[in-house]
């Protein structure tokens, strides 16, 4: 269903986003270091399948994804190499842009880690010293 909606929007000139990628289990207090632990099988079958169908079924030229606030295990999803590079880009052939969810003043979306591990753009701002590129 998502791929069809994205394709319909793209025909009208809309740049579709899939979000929140992935394991976004709760909205209440989601910025308070929500850590989600799950087996790879659970993640692939329960959390990623809908995203996979959307990515593989999209027929347009431009697509984007927004990473979620939560952590997958001990790694923020916005800096999760396995999720963003290995699965999304590698296995599924995603060629679009990946953006973080809003990075207010939470302090854990470290730009250097995000960019090195598959995010292309930081949404919002953070003036924390930890949020500077090192190279």
Segments predicted by a language model, with ranges:
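Glycoside hydrolase catalytic-domain context in secreted enzymes
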Residues: 1-135
């Amino acid at each position: 269903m998502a791929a069809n909606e994205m394709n319909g929007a793209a025909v009208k000139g809309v740049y579709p986003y899939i979000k929140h990628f992935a394991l976004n289990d709760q909205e209440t207090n989601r910025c308070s270091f929500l850590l989600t632990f799950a087996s790879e099988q659970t993640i692939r079958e329960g959390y990623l399948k809908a995203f996979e169908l959307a990515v593989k079924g999209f027929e347009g030229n431009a697509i984007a994804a927004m990473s979620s606030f939560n952590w997958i295990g001990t790694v923020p999803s916005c800096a999760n190499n396995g999720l963003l590079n290995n699965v999304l880009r590698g296995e599924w052939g995603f060629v679009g842009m990946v953006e973080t969810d809003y990075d207010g003043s939470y302090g854990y979306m470290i730009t250097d880690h995000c960019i090195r591990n598959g995010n292309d753009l930081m949404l919002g701002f953070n003036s924390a010293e930890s949020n500077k590129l090192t190279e």
